[in-house]
Design a protein with these regions (language model features):
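C-terminal accessory region downstream of the catalytic core in glycan-modifying enzymes
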Residues: 400, 450-484
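The feature marks proteins involved in alpha-glucan
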Residues: 1-14, 26, 472-480
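Aromatic- and carboxylate-lined catalytic core of secreted/periplasmic carbohydrate-active enzymes
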Residues: 211-212, 218-219, 378-417, 502, ...
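Active-site rim elements
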Residues: 22, 194-199, 319-329, 381-391, ...
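Conserved, mostly hydrophobic/aromatic
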Residues: 17, 42, 52, 71, ...
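C-terminal beta-strand-rich structural cap/linker in extracellular carbohydrate-active enzymes
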Residues: 478-517
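Conserved alpha/beta catalytic core and glycan-binding cleft of carbohydrate-active enzymes
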Residues: 165-167, 182-376, 405-452, 457, ...
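Substrate-binding/active-site clefts of carbohydrate-active enzymes
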Residues: 5-9, 18-199, 498
Length: 517
């Protein structure tokens, strides 16, 4: 049917999904199963944008959809094209924007299924010689200087917009596209690392053309660049000399969270460095932050919750079970997600299941695991079971997302640091009409903790420590605080005096009306 969906003009709160592994059973899920069983969960969770992975046809299921063979075909293992259209239409009726994970950075090297040697040569769509081979991915690299390649890829963008009514794209592997050596084994530390002889200017030209075409076809479409190098201008408007992406991912944020958890004791977390990393972005480019995506949960890596709790998750997630490692993990999981969202530039992303602390890692069926689907699924029963703690994390995430939408948190780009204490592991900042208070110290609580704040009345509207979120409940719910005047030279200061429990966070609202939905 003709597209009738009109996207709301609000910052994207993205729920990243893989249709095949979204089901509970140890098998490949379908578009129909996703529409009936998973889509309602996403709507209930409060996210406003759905990002679909692995849509383009790919021969090897374990590639996570990134080794594409047919760029114009939805993956047949998930169902028919009509099933995908029904999924998107249903999501639209629920108010969800639907984005597609678009793979234009390379193509599968398989010659029977893919484009390689399509006309008998290696260079019809790709570079000839060594440059046509991606050494890290064992795939073929497009030659973006060829008109037939530009026509092929640009028409592919329009095809998914027109035929399936996608609302935009996440462009995968942008770093690999724009550098001749694909950005491999390279550290980008200054502006001198950009715009030198290592740049593939043809690839940058293609990306600019793609953004122009997409926004001509759908002026309200969303395009997101996945780039780890920090190339300036990717998400700047073309009218200002940029390449036209609407957003770029803040990919340093999840890497920094993993580094903190792996390399530092809780009492040694460098709070100043954390604050810098959370806010390290250019003012002229919109960014989307996240604590973890599918990348952090792949085999060989671990989700944040599993890094924090580990094997204790198997035996100590009962609602009445008290375990110090579990308590620590649950507290930090909530705090990490809250501060990542609260400091996000212009959008936020979550990978399916991470909102309730899905255990373990993602491991697609392969020879090394006897072709098992055990870790290529989502165990929704964990969050449905009221006798386990997973549903408490899900409840917190629901209320956190609702708070961001109700208070239009990400509409306000200015994040104002009010107070930072590295020794005590305290960060306090203001955004919109909200004050966010974080005490990352693992064992020190602070009474009568004072910091300067705008004068007024403040009500606590979200508390990570609350029992309904799996916390010990050390604060009175919905308590109200008033600033006090401290006489100091050369001028007086308005101060808030608060109790800060160890390893906890809460949000204060500066108004007389309660903003909660």
């Amino acid at each position: 049917k003709k597209p009738t969906f009109k996207r709301k003009k609000e910052p994207p709160l993205i729920y990243e999904v893989h249709v095949g592994m979204a089901q509970e059973e140890e098998k490949i899920g379908t578009f129909q199963e996703f529409t009936h069983n998973v889509l309602p969960r996403i709507v209930d969770a409060g996210y406003n944008t759905l990002q679909l992975m692995a849509i383009q046809e790919h021969p090897y299921y374990g590639s996570f959809g990134y080794q594409v063979s047919n760029f114009f075909a939805p993956s047949s293992r998930f169902g028919t094209p009509e099933d995908l259209k029904k999924l998107i239409d249903t999501a639209h009726t629920q108010g969800l924007t639907v984005l597609m994970d678009l793979i234009h950075s390379h193509s599968v090297s398989n010659e029977i299924e893919g484009l390689s040697r399509f006309d008998g040569t290696l260079f019809q769509y790709f570079h000839d010689g060594p440059r046509g081979k991606h050494k890290a991915w064992d795939s073929r690299c497009f030659d973006y200087n060829k008109h037939q390649v530009l026509h092929f890829l640009l028409s592919n963008c329009r095809y998914w917009l027109d035929e399936f009514h996608f609302d935009g794209f996440r462009f995968d592997g942008v770093t690999s596209m724009i550098y001749l050596q694909h950005g491999l084994s390279r550290i980008f530390t200054s502006y001198n690392d950009y715009f030198d002889n290592s740049i593939d200017e043809d690839a940058l030209t293609y990306l600019a053309l793609a953004n122009r075409v997409i926004h001509c076809v759908r002026p309200d479409a969303i395009t997101i660049a996945e780039d780890v190098s920090g190339m300036p201008g990717l998400a700047a408007p073309q009218s200002n000399g940029g390449f036209g992406f609407d957003y770029r991912f803040a990919m340093g944020v999840p890497d920094y969270w993993i580094r903190l958890i792996k390399e530092f004791k809780d009492e040694d977390w460098p709070i100043g460095h954390l604050w810098f990393e959370l806010n390290n972005r250019r003012n002229d480019e919109k960014t989307i932050s996240y604590a973890e995506s599918h990348d952090q949960a792949l085999v060989g890596d671990q989700s944040i919750i599993f890094r924090l709790i580990g094997k204790e998750m198997y035996n100590h997630m009962g609602i009445n079970d008290h375990n110090l490692k579990v308590d620590r993990g649950i507290a930090l999981h909530k705090m990490i997600r809250l501060i990542t969202l609260a400091t996000a530039g212009n959008g936020y992303l979550n990978f399916m299941g991470n909102e309730f602390g899905h255990p373990e890692w993602i491991d697609f069926p392969r020879e090394g695991n006897n072709w098992s689907y055990k870790n290529a699924r989502r165990q929704w029963h964990l969050t449905d079971n009221v006798h386990l703690k997973y549903h408490l994390l899900a409840e917190f995430d629901n209320d956190m997302i609702a708070l961001a939408r109700t208070c239009r948190l990400l509409d306000q780009s200015n994040v104002q640091l009010l107070h930072e204490d590295t020794a005590k592991k305290v960060i306090i900042f203001k955004r919109a009409d909200l004050i966010f208070v974080f005490n990352f110290h693992p064992y020190c609580s602070f009474t009568d903790y004072r910091f300067e704040a705008p004068p007024g009345k403040y009500q606590m509207i979200l508390d990570c420590d609350a029992p309904e979120y799996g916390g010990p409940g050390r604060l009175l719910p919905k308590q109200t605080h008033f600033t006090i005047m401290e006489k100091q030279k050369p001028q007086n200061h308005h101060m808030l005096s608060l109790y800060l429990p160890a390893r906890s966070a809460f949000v204060l609202y500066s108004a007389t009306e309660d903003p909660q939905p």
